[in-house]
């Protein structure tokens, strides 16, 4: 089932550290019949695909839970996986009950319909059945219909065609609007302020136009893993994309229309792992993206707007740095605009980026969080940071003040 595979990949394998993932592969090697090369080369998506093939009933979810229960650092993850599995099973039971109830209603409805039709026929006056009908033939002459013909319903060519259409295209009731709007495409005429979200595996293809791309960068120095970020759009919405195959830089050219398939939606991003997931659009490669949509997709949010957003939101934008403070394991920057200011905390590899007050920073995939009642942006594993220009140091008093004392 697709639900089980989503749990295995998105809730399980994607939440493991690299060492933990390698441990799981090792412990499942015999049951999955992994060769040495497969064990070394398979990434999380490939392993999830292989588990689905080997255990089609639950995509190997039970096997993964048992393995996680034997690994000290993954016991909490095993509990979460059990909870997610229970949710799917409960949902499935609910669907079965609903289907059984609907079947009974349909059978009752059919019986009622048959009864009504019979009663309707009985209620037709006998004088009406026996009355001879007069109609015109194609030649204009009048023709009398026999009693038997008069009793039959009209079957003109038009009516026959309508009946055939009804049989071939049964009437469908309009879909009931979903209570959740997270996966809805915006209506034409409305310009979204936030990227659209999709969750789980999507086969596609989805045709999009590339709007903006970062340079490729190394996000894991130990295993030399590289990636780049992109912003793409359809005519009605835009998406943020993580691309984990840097060979695809040749496809992600601003203004180019491409088709993406077999991508994974996760935490507000579309994730692409293989070059085969992206292809050129050769037939009618035209897409009209409005200027307002393009501007909204790449716009920098105001600080006041960020302060109102939920924790866990990922932020892209270009901000002016007015203050810097170096710590033992991180660097804290103060960024601001005419609506307020905020702290940005960077860790690991991004502490090697040289940036001084007065410069403008481009931030991509920074997580909004808070500590000590102060909102801030922090770097995560896939964050990207670039100094756009080095300006003169700013006067901190020229930027509206919020409390940043815990960081400076």
UniProtKB/Swiss-Prot annotation:
Residues 84-208 are annotated as: Disordered. Its main location: nucleus. Constitutively expressed in the thymus, bone marrow and spleen. Isoform 1 and isoform 3 are present in liver (at protein level). Residues 92-102 have a biased composition (Basic residues). GO terms for cellular component: nucleus. Keywords: Nucleus. InterPro entries: DAPIN (IPR004020), DEATH-like_dom_sf (IPR011029), HIN-200 (IPR040205), HIN200/IF120x (IPR004021), NA-bd_OB-fold (IPR012340). SUPFAM superfamilies: DEATH domain, HIN-2000 domain-like. It comes from the Eukaryota. It is found in: Nucleus. Residues 150-159 have a biased composition (Polar residues). Belongs to the HIN-200 family. This is Interferon-activable protein 203. The gene is Ifi203.
